[in-house]
A protein has these predicted regions:
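Bacterial Sec-dependent N-terminal signal peptides
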Residues: 1-21
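Targeting-peptide/extracellular-domain and disordered-appendage signature
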Residues: 19-92, 97-169
Length: 169
């Protein structure tokens, strides 16, 4: 009887642990832009009272001027089913990691051919396929990092009080 109760307790404990939400849950943004299917896979970190974007000296979670995985956990990926233009520059069809270099007024958006990596720890600039600039605008507070795509091709990165957009065509 004691073994049975111990076993039952273990199963219940594992069940409770399995219900705990991930700190940075996985998310997917998909949209058809013209005749191209676009899918962005990313993880959604939360602000949780922290300074998100800022200087390294201010201990920002994502320091200005440094390569960021554009999400949490594994590097964010973007898949396009056909060649497409990003801010007027051609991106061949394929799967890419999506990195960014945040700045106070402008970000660099990076499409890198190494699609499978954890974070930006092994990021190599030599593998960049395309880099484009995107403007930052102030935005209502967004607790959880969110990527959206419209049918018109606007990709929006929203987190904390920042919103960054770039365009696919």
């Amino acid at each position: 009887m004691k073994k049975f109760l111990l076993l039952l307790t273990c199963f219940v404990s594992f069940g409770v642990l399995a219900q705990k939400a991930a700190p940075s849950p996985a998310a997917v943004a998909t949209q058809k832009v013209g005749n191209t299917e676009v899918m962005i896979k990313y993880a959604q970190p939360s602000v949780k009272g922290r300074l998100v974007f800022g200087t390294k000296e201010a201990k920002a979670l994502v320091p200005y001027g440094e390569v960021w995985r554009t999400g949490a956990n594994e590097a964010t990926t973007i898949e396009v089913s056909n060649d497409i233009t990003v801010q007027g520059k051609t991106l061949p069809k394929g799967i890419y990691s999506l990195f960014s270099i945040p700045g106070e007024t402008e970000w660099t958006i990076i499409f890198n051919k190494e699609a499978k990596m954890w974070g930006a720890y092994t990021y190599k600039e030599a593998n960049d396929v395309l880099r484009v600039k995107a403007r930052v605008s102030e935005h209502a507070h967004t607790e959880q990092f969110t990527i959206g795509i419209t049918a018109a091709g606007q990709v929006t990165l929203d987190w904390d009080k920042s919103s960054v957009s770039f365009y696919l065509k």
